[in-house]
Each structure stands twice: as C-alpha cells, then as structure tokens.
C-alpha cells in the first residue's frame, strides 16, 4: 500500500514538472524578472512589517539570536570531541532518519491514523 502511494506521488510530481516545463512559454529571462519582482515585493512587505516592531522586542530578538549562535558553537564543540566512530554512527543514523521522514509524513496524514476525533480522546478530555 505504501509503495503504491509513493509511486503515485512520484508519477504525479514527474508528470506535473514535465507539463510545467513544456507548457511554459516564458523565457528564462522572463522567469528571472518575475522572480526578482516577487522577491523585491516580499522584501518590501517584510521591511514594512519589521518597522512596526517595538525596539524592546528587536533587542530581545537580537539577544535570542546571539544565544542561539553560542548554543550552536557548543554543539559543534561537543560533536568534534566525539570519536570518529561516534561521529560516523550519528551520520549514518541521520541518513536513516531522513529515509523514514517521508513515509512517516504520509502515515501521519492518513485519515485512518488520525485519532483526534475518536471517542477515547474525547472521553479523556472530559475527565
């Protein structure tokens, strides 16, 4: 069943990309120009939004970002202290996690597995 779903998604994405590439009459320059205009509009919109942020909030965000940089440095230092074997294991583990992430998303979005409205969950909320 899962293989059929993945196969169906692959086919639909492939045919969709093919159809988009063959049906498009825009030249690469037109696409680039459109992307530049869209990008500039997004930047302008964000600048307007960012102008509404209070100075205290900006300072808070800056402090947050500095702390995140410090945390990431510490994570790199911890990782570099690991043995090569441990680093290799973590790299392989990450590859397996990435392989599992797509099927996991498909399963999570399956209506049969969605129990948010089940009677059991409603009973627990009422207690």
Curated annotation (Swiss-Prot):
Location in the cell: Cell membrane
Gene Ontology terms: cellular component: plasma membrane
Membrane topology (UniProt): Lipid-anchor
Residue numbers spanned by region Disordered: 102-127
Endpoints of the signal sequence: 1-16
Lipid-acceptor residues (S-diacylglycerol cysteine): 17
Protein name per UniProt: Uncharacterized lipoprotein RP051
Lineage: Bacteria, Pseudomonadati, Pseudomonadota, Alphaproteobacteria, Rickettsiales
């Amino acid at each position: 069943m899962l293989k059929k779903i993945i196969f169906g998604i692959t086919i639909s994405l492939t045919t969709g990309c093919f159809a988009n590439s063959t049906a498009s009459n825009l030249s690469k320059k037109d696409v680039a120009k459109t992307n530049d205009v869209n990008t500039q509009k997004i930047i302008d919109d964000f600048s307007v939004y960012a102008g509404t942020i209070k100075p205290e909030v900006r300072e808070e965000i800056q402090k947050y970002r500095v702390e995140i940089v410090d945390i990431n440095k510490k994570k790199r230092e911890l990782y570099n202290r690991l043995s090569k074997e441990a680093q290799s294991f973590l790299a392989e583990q990450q590859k397996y996690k990435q392989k599992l992430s797509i099927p996991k998303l498909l399963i999570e979005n399956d209506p049969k597995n969605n129990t948010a409205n089940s009677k059991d969950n409603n009973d627990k909320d009422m207690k």
